[in-house]
Amino acid sequence: MVSKEAIAAARAAYDIEAQCITEMKDYFDDEQFAKAVELLSSAPRIGTAGCGHSGIICQHMAHLMCCIERPARFISPAEAVHGATGFLQPGDVMIFASRGGKTKELLPIVDICKAKGVSIITVTENMESPLAQAADVVLKQHVNRETDKWNAQGTTSTTALCMIFHALQAAVIEQTGYRAEQFALIHPGGAVGERLNNKAL
């Protein structure tokens, strides 16, 4: 039988993450966010990179951009220093996600981006970190605490990162005038595709 403590921990997780999203609005920087939206709306290509949980959410961000026809791909930090950064060209944008802002695997990619004329957007909690200092745009990843009792698992921090990426996509949709009809063409599958293509919006 599942313990009362286990159920209590599960319920507390909802409260912790809901509180985090509410608090994040206090850290929303209109100027920095607007710069990020402008870059993402005009860049020929978008790269994303992160390690661990941040890397997984960066894969999600690349897909979010592709879903509104902003060409994007996740660039594995392991592959980035073995030629994968050839995807990036002058005028492109690279998004780095690192809660601490010091992820060593990402730092060589920064140097490549700088040399190639690629703009950098960094999402981090540490605004004084190397990745933040190297960026053209920095977005604050506020985290109240992780949901596990040790405050160590990548839980609330991934929710915070997702929230920022979701907000960016919503803004880019508005900025570029992307239409439901365009999305319907590239998303014919599933319930979403059926709804869009039947124009039951």
Feature names for model-found ranges:
Residues 12, 16, 28-31, 35, ...:
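Conserved active-site and cofactor/substrate-binding residues in soluble primary-metabolism enzymes
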Residues 40-43, 95, 190:
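Alpha-helix boundary/capping residues
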